[in-house]
Amino acid sequence: MMTQTLLIELLTEELPPKALNNLGNHFAASVAEGLEKAQLVDGAAEFTAYASPRRLAVQVKNVKAVQADQKIVKKGPAVANAMKDGAPTKALEGFARGAGAKIEDLTIVHDGKQDVYAYEYVQIGKPLGGLLEDIINQAVKKLPIPKVMRWGSSTFTFVRPVHGLVVLHGGDIVNVSVLGLQSGNKTLGHRFLSDGEITIENADSYAAQMREQGKVVASFAERKAAIQTVLEGQARRLNATAAADEALLDEVTALVEWPVVLEAGFEEHFLAVPQECLILTMQQNQKYFPLLDQNGKLMNRFLLVSNLQTEDPSHIIQGNERVLRARLSDAEFFYKQDQKATLESRLPKLTNVVYHNKIGSQAERIERLQSIAAHIAKALGADAAAAERAARLAKADLVTEMVGEFPELQGTMGKYYARLDGETEEITEAVEQHYQPRFAGDNLPEGKIAAAVALADKLETLVGIWGIGLIPTGDKDPYALRRAALGILRMLMQYGLDVNELIQTAFNSFPQGLLNEKTPSETADFMQARLAVLLQNDYPQDIVAAVLAKQPRRLDDLTAKLQAVAAFKQLPEAAALAAANKRVQNLLKKADAELGAVNESLLQQDEEKALFAAAQGLQPKIAAAVAEGNFQTALSELASVKPQVDAFFDGVMVMAEDAAVKQNRLNLLNRLAEQMNAVADIALLGE
């Protein structure tokens, strides 16, 4: 059957830039999926998504004009029950009637179990035009659009008004109606660089015609790659690097249909303002690409992406420079104003900054952070006074002009202002870094003072918010407690502190009776669950479960334990020892009395004597290895007792009739279990 390329384009008003790429990909994928389900393509649809500020489009290869005819077999009642005394039963008659057939039209087929009556017929394939309208409408409905709008007198809704619809199969228009628009082959190009309508000659010529006649690079991916290439080239020419993160690059790509990269600049005196402020202003407000020199310092040059191409771009450059100058002047003003007061002098204003109405203001919070940070610093062997001072100043920049304008700069501005106030570098860095890690993969705070304040900040948040009942549920976590927990865990994996003791310290910093009394135990359980999630990114679930079953309170040796258990699992003896350990644990659950020391005089059989001797020899080796942090050696020692363990279970009845003998054997197994599980609960391996 002949196939041709299918093109669908929705011509719209300017689409939301941050959502554009996602909308384009969803629309294209939904159309392709609809064509696959309708069997208008063979196998997986080969498609290309297009998305620009004024259009969403998809091009699908090898689309059929008509569905293939299908042989349909409707199966009915079993032959054995379908006839009675030579006449059809009511079941058979009902099946024939439902199938729109006569009894004599039915055939007999085997359904894999028995012979049944069936009605076989050929379903004639439907034409593309009869199916495509519903496919497009369904694709439009499935788009991830949080808010829709109506336009004109239309009752249809979409993310932005839609003014044109192109639907071509090869060179032929497919007649459909979508969002109140009749399909055609005409569209519009660039709003300013293109004149009049463009007639798309063929579905395959779409991208080329839009580029040549419409001055539109329709492919989002192609525009993005082109912008990135030119940005990098321009930056190299200036011996610089363009600060171009993915989010900004995506947003700029979504704002232009014909990208033109231009170089511009600003006055050098603005460089006296911390570069983070200038970069944020350029990127967030103006969508510009700042340029950094070889030392990572901001230059007074930047790159911008225009949607216009002119012989003389100077007016575009000057216009953008003028707008940026106003923005930078504001930042400069805020910076100068903020320097008129020290961070210390700003602290009383934090009384008016509500943290949460149930647990007080930021000023009250600062008191808690100081005590927690000082406690942690002592535990780390660091300067408690420095940690307390850093915690005291950590939130002071929240009431500065600059942070009021750019909340993203909290911490960063605190560092600069603390430095201007004459604080030590250790304290200034802690003020900035106490928010870290802000997200998965973010850097951890550098140095013990910064770590102490960062841990204090996250512990106080977790314990306080949890303690007033604002517990994360499902995908709702408004106070980012999961993120706080992961940040705490990542830091504790670096520093050897007792997680439960830290939680209790944070809890004790709140007024008595303010928080739920179960908060320490509940947050400890929550941390354990988040720790499992964190570790399962790098280790199999059973290995993580085995290590965490010991409920480690110090996390700095977790990685070594996980690696040791992973190595142990590869040993030929591991599976049998894990099974034996599980058996031991099940037997120990049946103990009637408290487990204690092994009485050698009650050991009767050679197998239990041999196991006792092996356990005796094993104990000091494992204890020494664990004490030295050599967990792999500790676990590998277990392999040496496998023969004795196997022989014991093969030849000894643990639950003997003699109560004293039974208790002694359980004591022996308990001693063995202590050694087998010194590093991890190996019974969980393989589950």
From Swiss-Prot:
Keyword Aminoacyl-tRNA synthetase listed: yes
Organism: Neisseria meningitidis serogroup B (strain ATCC BAA-335 / MC58)
Protein's UniProt name: Glycine--tRNA ligase beta subunit
GO molecular function annotation: arginine-tRNA ligase activity; ATP binding; glycine-tRNA ligase activity
UniProt keyword annotations, A-Z: Aminoacyl-tRNA synthetase, ATP-binding, Cytoplasm, Ligase, Nucleotide-binding, Protein biosynthesis
InterPro entries linked to this entry: DALR_anticod-bd, Gly-tRNA-synth_bsu, Gly-tRNA-synth_heterodimer
Reaction equations catalysed: tRNA(Gly) + glycine + ATP = glycyl-tRNA(Gly) + AMP + diphosphate
EC number in record: 6.1.1.14
Entry-linked SUPFAM superfamilies: HD-domain/PDEase-like
EC class of the enzyme, as a word: ligase
Subunit (UniProt): Tetramer of two alpha and two beta subunits.
Record's GO cellular component terms: cytosol
